[in-house]
């Protein structure tokens, strides 16, 4: 064993003392620090917020550095993402600027299960399941009533609250981000949100449990070339209820679809397109840029897109009407064409 290993572990343990009240609780599964002084933890009742003066920015950076050294890794502006394991077996994801907002640091700790649960206990609270194949009945869709009535504000509000995957489409300056911010405001406050964008435009309630991640390229003058795909992968280790990706531009579209299809429903994103069908087509073509999709036929990827994206909202800025921005089309996979 490396002679420095015990010292490195001791350093991590020392800096983890500020989190001991939550790490020691058996009923807590996730611990998240979104910004200095603010901690969120998830127990059987959901997410809870706790203020902690010990979690200063300097302390968080010291913990990040100690964790990186313990794992023989680096965390710095050039390498702002760290996925590692703590001495106690907990998994940790750390994000530092420029991949998150200046003056912040994101820390997510997932505690391992301390016992092996017998199958009988795991299934104790299972919903009643049909004993005969094919006997299950589809649940009523609460979105169909406002959809049929053309009550679009109610429809979109319920869609967000129901965790539908929504794509906002439109041309430059059409109001895509404005609508995405309005939709984000309907996300239930109990959820944990991770946003991914190149420039901070998404606005969330400061009181909610959220983290803003930022990507860039060397040509934009950023110190770190962190891609949207890298941040999507990091976000999946940050206990998100849902992921908001400000704009889809390339192969990261496939990673976004994978995230939405793997238990992180309710994703919202935007793309440049003039109609719902063009948006679905563009999203399919973006997926084809992903290394894992380049040999897949268009029809296969189009089917994937339409199986994951529930709703496409098209916005438009019309000249000659006071440059008014408005919704001009809504596509709903489970509904009839919009009237």
From Swiss-Prot:
Chief localization: membrane
Single GO MF descriptor: ATP hydrolysis activity
Catalytic activity, EC: 7.4.2.8
Effect of residue 175 to S: Strongly reduces PTX secretion
Binding site for ATP: 170-177
Disulphide bond pairs: none
Induction: Cotranscribed with ptxABCDE. Activated by the two-component regulatory system BvgS/BvgA.
Compartments it resides in: Cell inner membrane
Superkingdom of source: Bacteria
GO biological process, one term: secretion by the type IV secretion system
An example Gene Ontology CC term for this record: plasma membrane
Coiled coil stretches, renumbered: none
Annotated Gene3D superfamilies: 3.30.450.90, P-loop containing nucleotide triphosphate hydrolases
Record key words, sorted: ATP-binding, Cell inner membrane, Cell membrane, Membrane, Nucleotide-binding, Protein transport, Translocase, Transport, Virulence
Family statement drawn from the similarity comment of this UniProt entry: Belongs to the GSP E family.
Function: ATPase component of the type IV secretion system Ptl required for secretion of assembled pertussis toxin (PTX) through the outer membrane. Acts as a molecular motor to provide the energy that is required for the export of proteins.
Name of the featured protein: Type IV secretion system protein PtlH
Organism: Bordetella pertussis (strain Tohama I / ATCC BAA-589 / NCTC 13251)
